[in-house]
């Protein structure tokens, strides 16, 4: 992949795709191809086929997805499964059909079994039942990953897959009903402080353990792997550090200046009890995350206050 390669970033308006575009631009890549949803509906196979036939991208970063937190996944599992399956299969198939030299597919750590060994190695994929709260999304992501693997197996396509941990950062969604836990907590504590509320109620017990990766670190890892990895196995991307959701809530409350009480509603689900990635493969390849959670949280809050995140407030 050189500076004049024609590179298509699917999902460039999302957090992950936007970070990949910024990383490509920062490293001097000059021919980055993007399309908005209005210009190209990735769920429509005919549109995707025409786009690839006309543009002929040499490299593809497949970052497009319909995403959401526990509530959003529970409310619309059929939509999550259908939309993600369609946009994944359409892009991956067209990339193969029209001679794309290499594709990177962005999976998710939620594809691992609910009771997977911790930290979770890549080999434990499909070794047990999925977490019910995001099963539809996970099934779609597994299908995309497997399609890349089968195209490699049957046709020799250099299509690789990565599994990032929970992401946050510039361009995240702060939608009150559909966002993931970290941006949801930023919004909730910010608004509670502004309104002078005495307490904030959070879902679950606060005991679930999670790992968080800043989106710009993910982008750097994706560019690194696009250049240096052509293996058959998917690769985990994370920080190797975890904390409880309760600890995360306390960090965010302190950051925004909320001094009230945090109350946990245990009638609401926690999701998977623990989710930490085994990064042995990634570290052996020579890449490690740079941005710690304590460094990344203020950047995410600044995005919520002044950046693209303002659009969903």
Label the model's feature ranges.
Residues 89-134:
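Conserved Rossmann-fold NAD(P)-dependent oxidoreductase catalytic core, especially the SDR/UDP-sugar
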């Amino acid at each position: 992949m050189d500076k004049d390669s024609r590179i298509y970033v699917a999902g460039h308006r999302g957090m992950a795709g936007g970070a990949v575009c910024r990383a490509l631009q920062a490293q001097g890549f000059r021919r980055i191809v993007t399309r908005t949803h209005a210009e190209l509906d990735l769920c429509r196979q005919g549109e995707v086929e025409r786009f690839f036939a006309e543009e002929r991208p040499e490299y593809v970063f497949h970052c497009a997805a319909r995403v959401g937190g526990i509530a959003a996944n529970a409310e619309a599992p059929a939509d999550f499964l259908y939309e993600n399956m369609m946009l994944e299969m359409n892009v991956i198939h067209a990339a193969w059909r029209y001679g794309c030299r290499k594709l990177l597919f962005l999976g998710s750590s939620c594809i691992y079994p609910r009771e997977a060994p911790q930290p979770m190695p890549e080999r434990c994929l499909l070794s047990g039942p999925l977490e019910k709260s995001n099963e539809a999304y996970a099934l779609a992501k597994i299908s995309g990953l497997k399609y890349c693997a089968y195209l490699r197996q049957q046709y020799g396509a250099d299509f690789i897959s990565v599994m990032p941990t929970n992401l946050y950062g510039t361009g995240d969604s702060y939608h009150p009903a559909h966002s993931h836990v970290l941006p949801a907590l930023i919004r909730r504590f910010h608004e509670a402080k502004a309104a002078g509320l005495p307490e904030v109620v959070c879902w679950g017990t606060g005991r679930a353990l999670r790992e968080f990766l800043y989106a710009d670190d993910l982008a750097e890892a994706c560019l690194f792997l696009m250049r240096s990895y052509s293996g058959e196995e998917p690769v985990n991307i994370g920080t190797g550090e975890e904390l409880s959701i309760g600890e995360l809530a306390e960090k965010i409350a302190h950051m925004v200046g909320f001094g009230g009480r945090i109350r946990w509603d245990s009638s609401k689900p926690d999701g998977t009890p623990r989710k930490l990635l085994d990064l042995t493969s990634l570290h052996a390849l020579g890449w490690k995350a740079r941005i710690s959670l304590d460094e990344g949280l203020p950047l995410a809050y600044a995005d919520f206050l002044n950046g693209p995140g303002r659009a969903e407030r």
